[in-house]
């Protein structure tokens, strides 16, 4: 097991290159099941969730080669094992995304109920009900989903609530269904748009991605392609907040700023100067203490839940009072006790944190609990006086590619050591 050791109080300055999107890579990897040939992905991030997905697909019969230049060759066209075992999916909720493609391509699937971050329930009923509407027969028994379908038939799907992974699962299943599928109340995230772009390149007929209504015309087969994964807007946002919290200046390269409007708007409210170019963002805090900002998470294009914890760390040392309200997931405040131990003035009231900014945080031993909470502890450690150690950094590795190395490029004193 590894831990991070951070000597805080240093202003971050420099530039970093954003990796490919975790939340785009995973569904595209599962989409390889649909293809009749190999897929080559470029800009693939080296993350533990990507590695877990590849191990899962390999266990099913897929073949892959992951290059050091972040390109990935994967052939998932001829699976021999239609079972996603618990030992491979227990750490990653995205494993449910194998269900739609397997049903569409092979007519059956057995998938363990997924694991992942312990940030409250994320029920899979939306996936299962929608697939049943397409014609699948589904049973849940002994922790596994058993699904069969002689044929998937296009229909109208009305999601009761917005779900990114359910939207992705049904899009993929519908690409090989007979007839037209229309998804209402679909998620609109950029990562869904990226998945759809890849599927269209494979031969799918899809319209409406990025809106609340997505229409899929089923086709007979999909082909292998070469595709570049979009940049990770959450990773980019995390480094922007890290720079703002330490009063520095950063250039983020390989980024689509158009997908980050809600994040950039809040950073402007903190007092940061921001300039955007075609594929880069420049943020300059000019040594200032950030101003507190109110946050309320919601579905895209509003403020993303995956940036809530990072802005909580920023508000902890910001000038003024703020509220942070979480509307997407229950129990996504497990970073609050650890930040409070560092000296943050945070009061949790239901799904809202009330924060009075303090001038200083104090470094100390911390324990990471989930992916984004881990990131908030790193940011707090960067601005704290003294030394901070963070245990269980495997949570970070699920969504951040070599985070300590990128922070070192910005001047941070941070190292990864083995216990």
From Swiss-Prot:
Documented EC number(s): 2.5.1.7
List of residues binding phosphoenolpyruvate: 22-23
Example of a GO MF term: UDP-N-acetylglucosamine 1-carboxyvinyltransferase activity
Keywords: Cell cycle, Cell division, Cell shape, Cell wall biogenesis/degradation, Cytoplasm, Peptidoglycan synthesis, Pyruvate, Transferase
Gene3D superfamilies reported for this sequence: Enolpyruvate transferase domain
Reaction(s) catalysed (UniProt annotation): phosphoenolpyruvate + UDP-N-acetyl-alpha-D-glucosamine = UDP-N-acetyl-3-O-(1-carboxyvinyl)-alpha-D-glucosamine + phosphate
Modified positions (2-(S-cysteinyl)pyruvic acid O-phosphothioketal) in chain numbering: 117
InterPro entries: Enolpyruvate_Tfrase_dom, Enolpyruvate_Tfrase_sf, MurA_subfamily, RNA3'P_cycl/enolpyr_Trfase_a/b, UDP_GlcNAc_COvinyl_MurA
GO biological process annotation, one example: cell division
Location(s), subcellular: Cytoplasm
GO cellular component: cytoplasm
Residues annotated to bind UDP-N-acetyl-alpha-D-glucosamine: 93, 306, 328
Pathway(s) served: Cell wall biogenesis; peptidoglycan biosynthesis
Top-level enzyme category: transferase
Active-site residue list: 117
Short name of one Pfam family: EPSP_synthase
Family, similarity comment: Belongs to the EPSP synthase family. MurA subfamily.
Function: Cell wall formation. Adds enolpyruvyl to UDP-N-acetylglucosamine.
PANTHER family assigned to the protein according to its UniProt record, in alphabetical order: UDP-N-ACETYLGLUCOSAMINE 1-CARBOXYVINYLTRANSFERASE
NCBIfam families: murA (TIGR01072), PRK09369.1 (NF006873)
Entry protein name: UDP-N-acetylglucosamine 1-carboxyvinyltransferase
Organism the protein comes from: Vesicomyosocius okutanii subsp. Calyptogena okutanii (strain HA)
Lineage of the species this protein comes from: Bacteria, Pseudomonadati, Pseudomonadota, Gammaproteobacteria, Candidatus Pseudothioglobaceae
């Amino acid at each position: 097991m590894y831990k991070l050791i951070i000597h805080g109080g240093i202003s971050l300055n420099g530039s970093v290159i954003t990796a490919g999107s975790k939340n785009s890579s995973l569904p595209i990897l599962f989409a390889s099941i649909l293809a009749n040939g190999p897929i080559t992905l470029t800009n693939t991030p080296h993350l533990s969730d990507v590695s877990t997905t590849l191990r899962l697909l390999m266990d099913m019969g897929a073949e892959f080669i992951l290059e050091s230049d972040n390109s990935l060759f994967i052939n998932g066209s001829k699976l021999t094992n239609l079972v996603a075992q618990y030992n491979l999916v227990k750490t990653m909720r995205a494993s449910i995304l194998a269900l739609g493609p397997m049903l569409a391509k092979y007519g059956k699937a057995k998938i363990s109920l997924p694991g992942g971050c312990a940030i409250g329930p994320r029920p899979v009923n939306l996936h299962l009900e929608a697939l049943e509407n397409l014609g699948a027969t589904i049973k849940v028994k002994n922790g596994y989903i058993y699904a069969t379908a002689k044929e998937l038939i296009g229909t109208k799907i009305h999601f009761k609530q917005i779900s990114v992974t359910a939207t992705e699962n049904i899009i993929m299943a519908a690409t090989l269904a007979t007839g037209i599928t229309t998804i209402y109340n679909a998620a609109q995230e950029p990562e869904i748009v990226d998945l759809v772009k890849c599927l269209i390149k494979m031969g799918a007929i899809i319209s409406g991605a990025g809106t609340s209504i997505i229409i899929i015309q089923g086709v007979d087969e999909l082909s292998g392609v070469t595709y570049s994964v979009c940049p990770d807007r959450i990773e980019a946002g995390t480094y922007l907040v890290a720079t703002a919290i330490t009063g520095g200046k950063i250039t983020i390269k390989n980024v689509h700023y158009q997908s980050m409007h809600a994040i950039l708007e809040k950073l402007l409210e903190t007092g940061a100067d921001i300039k955007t170019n075609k594929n880069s963002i420049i943020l300059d805090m000019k040594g200032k203490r950030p101003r507190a900002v109110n946050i309320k998470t919601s579905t895209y294009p509003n403020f993303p839940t995956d940036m809530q914890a990072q802005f909580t760390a920023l508000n902890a040392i910001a000038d003024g009072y703020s509220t942070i309200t979480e509307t997407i997931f229950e129990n996504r405040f497990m970073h609050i006790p650890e930040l409070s131990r560092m000296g943050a003035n945070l009061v949790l009231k239901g799904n809202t944190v009330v924060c009075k900014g303090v001038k200083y945080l104090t470094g100390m031993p911390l324990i990471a609990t989930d992916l984004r909470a881990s990131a908030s502890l790193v940011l707090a450690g960067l601005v704290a006086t003294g030394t901070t150690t963070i245990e269980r950094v495997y949570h970070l590795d699920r969504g951040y590619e070599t985070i300590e190395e990128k922070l070192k490029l910005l001047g941070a004193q941070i190292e990864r050591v083995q216990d």
